[in-house]
Regions:
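Bacterial Sec-dependent N-terminal signal peptides
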Residues: 1-24
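Non-catalytic cap/lid and distal C-terminal segments of serine-dependent acyl enzymes
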Residues: 21-25, 31-32, 37-65, 69-416, ...
């Protein structure tokens, strides 16, 4: 296996230079890359599926189309040209929906998760990553008494939030649609980038944006079974999330500084909750939605309602299947004399996130700006006298939804949201049942890291295949379904493994007692997503940052920093989403076993964006010079300029897994004046390279390492294909007299081991 990995890495370094110069907006022009956005805005899709009988491309910007199979087993098609925007798509392989395994970008969802293609065009769009000051997006866990468990939400804070520590900000509660998760307005709606750009242009006020999960009943089956539904979302929002936000963020606690809105079901929830809580909200936004026309004490007193609302904004596409309902609702408001703003789009493919992003760009400039919102309300809406409740409508009037049949019906709901499958379903005995709907399949198998080989599944009612598994050891395991030879992630599991390539699902088997990686009832830190300007590559890049419970940018307390690097094909999200480093640190800190620290998780692979921009024609995973330059000259200075951190080497650590371990050794051992803790987890470093790195200056001399390092750590599983390589590295350290610690547990090249590595190392850092 060691020889195999070395061969793979070397082969990539040799072959990838043959990639042609990338086209504008596209990925590298290699035969199987996908998607490729060509110079004329056509898009080429490729899928390696040599055994498939049929492959169809299903993209939001075009009708479904049959792909053509080449002699090498690659299925291909070129569509377009396409109007610049971000579009979801997937492949249908012999009738089974499949993500694009070459595309790192996916659409978070409770159901099937499409891939996304970004057609950028010649000019940056409203949602583009521009070189402007960026806000942060925090992933937070709050205790919900309503639900009896921890809820999830995302919170955007504007660029000046951490600097202007005496400033308070207005808040916009922004809710996504049916089957969407709390991440969608961030990862698909790009709300943070749209607002960053508008703020930089002076077109919008700075504000906090809160993204709740619109379907809290789905958190666990126990919640569905034990809580009386009612307005579960509204109760959680009012009684739990809003108090959490106002206790943990500097908000202006006044109705004139609160807005609520959303897309699709989220628009319905936002309007319904906002209109029945006008003592708390004065800005209401509905994107591709509508709500009840019978809300008490709202519509029949137009004068009072109008006085309470600063902005009532309604937007919908004329080709949206909800256009009829949305138009009916807007006309109802007009008849009732309720002031509102209406905007209708065409050519954005209906009920889509292209519309949702556009609507944000139109409403952000109006929020918390009474002059602008009043101008919009006055210009767009003619205030009409309310009709008496018993006065009939004019004879010619026919509701829009009846005229054009664009309305929500039980039949349409059933077609859009067929009966779901719960998978995985966890049981009290520690097992879980995995299920997938595949009525036409001949053979379905389960593949997972919790067992060897493949497990055959059994077909049951409605064409649902199932199997129940109990692993030997409770843990978090990646898994997939193999349907007639086609591998797919579990379409009913929201938990997915972030990766530049194929993305497996994640199954979390809990032990009877909470483990170090579990979310426990302790003080929680936050994981924030933000952007920094890279001097090494010349454009803005993403980074994840964990700050411990109690961290306050307004406080004078400073913290040590761990720079934590992911492995090959992983992303900057993997240590958070799979490694669970935030939960591990929360629990260790709460028990007094680890020092409170900040953890920085950079994206260690700049090549995809460099190739896209024409700055590179190859990806060289073996090279560590670029990543070392990136970490030392861009990431570390950004953190030390923007966070309350200790800036001496005794308070800096660097660690990484696999390829990230290789990069950690080069950056850490090569810069002993910057890092005094260097920890490599199953590093992708090979025998001949170790001595060469000491001789060519990649690593500092052994005497200097011993003199300056507080900890050099090496760990690897005894079944890991890099185990022998790690033993060679340890032997080299011993021969050079480098003091170090080791950890060699059982297990392979897995994130189960990674979680154990970081748990052990975190207890040794900064002590």
């Amino acid at each position: 296996m060691l020889r195999k990995l070395f061969s793979v890495l070397t082969l990539m370094a040799v072959l990838i230079p043959a990639i042609a110069q990338p086209q504008r907006g596209g990925r590298p022009m290699v035969s199987s890359a996908s998607p490729i956005v060509n110079a004329d805005n056509t898009v080429t899709f490729n899928l390696d599926a040599p055994h498939a009988k049929s492959v169809i491309i299903s993209a939001q910007f075009a009708p479904k189309a049959e792909m053509q199979k080449r002699e090498d087993g690659i299925w291909t098609i070129t569509l377009g040209p396409v109007k610049p925007d971000i579009y979801p798509y997937c492949f249908e392989v012999d009738g089974i929906a499949v993500q694009d395994p070459q595309n790192p970008d996916w659409f978070p969802n409770e159901g099937f998760k499409n891939s996304m293609v970004d057609v950028r065009g010649a000019e940056p769009m409203d949602h583009a990553v521009k070189s402007v000051p960026h806000g942060k997006v925090d992933y937070v866990n709050y205790w919900s008494e309503t639900l009896g468990l921890h809820g999830n939400a995302l919170v955007y804070t504007p660029p000046t939030y951490d600097k202007n520590v005496n400033e308070k900000y207005p808040v916009f509660y922004l809710i996504s649609g049916t089957t969407d998760t709390e991440e969608v307005y961030f990862k698909v709606g790009k709300m943070n980038l749209i607002l960053d750009n508008l703020i930089a242009e002076g077109k919008a006020k700075e504000m906090i944006i809160v993204l709740p999960y619109g379907n809290p009943a789905k958190y666990t089956s126990e919640v569905r079974n034990t809580i009386e539904f009612g307005d579960l979302f509204g109760k959680d929002l009012l009684n739990d999330l809003m108090p959490y936000v106002e206790a943990n963020y500097r908000t202006i606690e006044d109705r004139d500084y609160r807005a609520i809105g959303g897309f699709s079901r989220g628009g319905n929830q936002g309007l319904s909750f906002g209109l029945t809580n006008l003592d708390k909200f004065s800005y209401l936004c509905s994107y591709s939605s509508f709500t009840s026309m019978t809300l008490p004490d709202v519509y029949d007193n137009a004068k009072k309602t109008n006085k309470q609302i600063n902005l009532f904004w309604l937007g919908c596409g004329t080709d949206d299947f909800l256009y009829g309902n949305a138009k009916d609702y807007a006309e109802f408001l007009d008849r009732k004399g309720i002031r509102n703003v209406q905007e209708y789009t065409t050519g954005m493919f209906g009920h889509t996130w292209m519309n949702a992003r556009y609507f944000l760009s139109q409403t952000f400039p109006l929020l918390f700006n009474k002059e602008a919102s009043e101008a919009a309300m006055s210009k767009t809406t003619a205030v009409k006298k309310p009709k008496k409740s018993n006065e009939p409508l004019p004879a010619p009037y026919v509701p829009t939804s009846e005229r054009n049949n664009q309305r929500l019906t039980p039949e349409l709901m059933a077609a859009l949201f067929p009966p779901g499958v719960v998978s995985p379903k966890y049981h009290a005995d520690g097992s879980a049942t995995f299920s997938v709907h595949a009525p036409n399949a001949q053979k379905v198998e389960l593949e997972g890291q919790m067992f060897e080989g493949l497990k055959p599944m059994e077909k049951g009612e409605r064409g649902v295949w199932s199997i129940t598994i109990k692993p030997d050891q409770p843990d978090i395991y990646p898994y997939s379904f193999i349907i007639d030879g086609t591998k797919i992630a579990d379409p009913n599991n929201v938990e997915i493994f972030p990766n530049e390539g194929y993305k497996a699902s994640l199954a979390d088997f809990k032990a009877p007692e909470p483990d170090h990686q579990d979310l426990q009832k302790v003080p929680h830190g936050k994981v924030s997503y933000t952007w920094y300007t890279s001097k090494a590559v010349g454009f803005d890049r993403p980074v994840c940052i964990y700050t411990p419970a109690g961290y306050d940018p307004a406080d004078s307390k400073k913290y040590p920093v761990l720079y934590l690097i992911h492995g090959m094909t992983d992303t900057y999200e993997t240590w958070f989403k799979v490694g669970k480093v935030n939960n591990i640190l929360d629990n260790l800190i709460a028990k007094g076993l680890a020092e409170p620290m900040i953890v920085v998780m950079p994206y260690a692979n700049p090549y995809p964006e460099m190739i896209l921009r024409g700055q590179a024609t190859m990806y060289n995973p073996m090279d560590t010079q670029l990543t070392t330059k990136e970490f030392t000259e861009s990431v570390v200075p950004f953190i030390e300029e923007n966070y309350n951190v200790l800036t001496d080497a005794d308070n800096r650590a660097i660690a990484g897994f696999s390829l990230g371990g290789r990069q950690t050794l080069a950056c850490g051992l090569g810069n002993p004046d910057m890092f005094h803790y260097v920890c490599a987890f199953a590093p992708a470093i090979f025998g001949p390279e170790i001595s060469a790195n000491f001789e060519n200056g990649t690593y500092a001399p052994a005497t200097e390492i011993n003199e300056k390092m507080n900890l050099v750590w090496l760990s690897c599983g005894t079944s890991d294909f890099l185990y022998q390589s790690s033993l060679q590295l340890e032997k080299n350290f011993q021969e050079r007299g480098i003091e170090h610690k080791t950890m060699y547990p059982g297990g392979g090249h897995t994130w189960m081991n990674c979680r154990d590595y970081i748990t052990a190392v975190a207890q040794l850092l900064f002590k």
